[in-house]
Amino acid sequence: MTPDEITAIDTAHIWHPYAAPGSGNLPVVRTHGVFLELADGRTLIDAMSSWWAAAHGHGHPRLVRAAHEQIDRMAHVMFGGLTHEPAARLTHNLLALTGGADGPNYSRVFLADSGSVSVEVAIKMALQYARGTGHPERNRLLTWRSGYHGDTFAAMSVCDPDGGMHSMWQGVLAEQRFAPAPPVRGASEDERAAYLAEFEQLMDDDVAAVVIEPVVQGAGGMRFHDAELVRGVRELCTKHGVLLLADEIATGFGRTGQLFTTLDNGVVPDILCVGKAITGGFMTLAAVLTTDEVAAGMEPSAIMHGPTFMGNPLACAVAAEATDIIAEGDWREQTRNIETWLTQALAPARNIAGVADVRVLGAIGVVEMAFDVDMAATTQAAVDHGVWIRPFGRNIYTMPPFVCTEDQVRQIGRAVVAAAEAAAAAHKDTQEQDQ
């Protein structure tokens, strides 16, 4: 197909995520390393890691080899009543990566199709555990605002009910309990203590589990908070006999500069969701990890959830290799370097009118504006600098592949700063037109 034919069919017929039909989309013909090649010949740095998944860049040779070798043997087989080596190898790796000095923290793994599905399954686990341990009245969940956990119905029910993207579903979704958004990184000890006291007031007898994104809230606002707060929530869950469900789909596998933002800070969730970078961005897969205690308490012990492509051997083989790469540890130096380079490269954004905050953690960089940004203007400004980003709400942000060079990260920084300037200019124009 020609680029024009692709665009014509796309515009006329294809729905894209979080977009109305007919929205403009750039045709991509090839990816390699940190780059996207467009149909018109332009090359862009993928500063989003294709929605935070391609941590090792596109087309990593070890992942390509794993995919080729597996597809020649077995691309798919049902997971009901059958098993296979890729699933066993991946499970072994996940249990090892999430283990501590005293041994494994987890003993059970559910392989899901996507991050949203993993949260859905984790919620089922928590509710089944409550019933199985004699607490059927525990049928609600507690979370904090500004969170995002996915687009399926149970996952949507624990996303921010007002400021999130699922507010249209109020009255249809299960009603959960919401604490205020957590105090941001750098909050005082007194602020954290006051927040945790308020959080505890919501831990009524009907709460089965607390659901949080630890340290970084992703698509709900790219907000950072301190690990001490997560430790405080863990203590409250233990005190009240409530399960802690941690969504590390975005943060897991090194994105923040830590392997996992819970475990690396001394917090062991009862249920842990991981995904995105689990396959290095090759294909969709996620996992839910839990303990023997939770598994034994569930009634019935079977989880009534069975996706057609659960445990897909092709996805598992690639994920096993991707988690081998993570286990080798190069991501530690890579994310330390990216954090340094992004901090320097994004600093000029602080001088732009309308910038509310600039923050960096590991391989995450955020420029937050004081107003909702014009997505078209900001995206185009970055593309003009040879970089692909996807702003949302007030946030212009980047989660680059770990394999980016210093020059590439600095180019990303210049593009994000240019996007912030474009957002400020577009906002000013809108204000002047409204006068």
Identify the residue ranges that each predicted region occupies.
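Conserved N-terminal phosphate-binding loop of PLP-dependent enzymes in the Aspartate aminotransferase
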Residues: 1-435
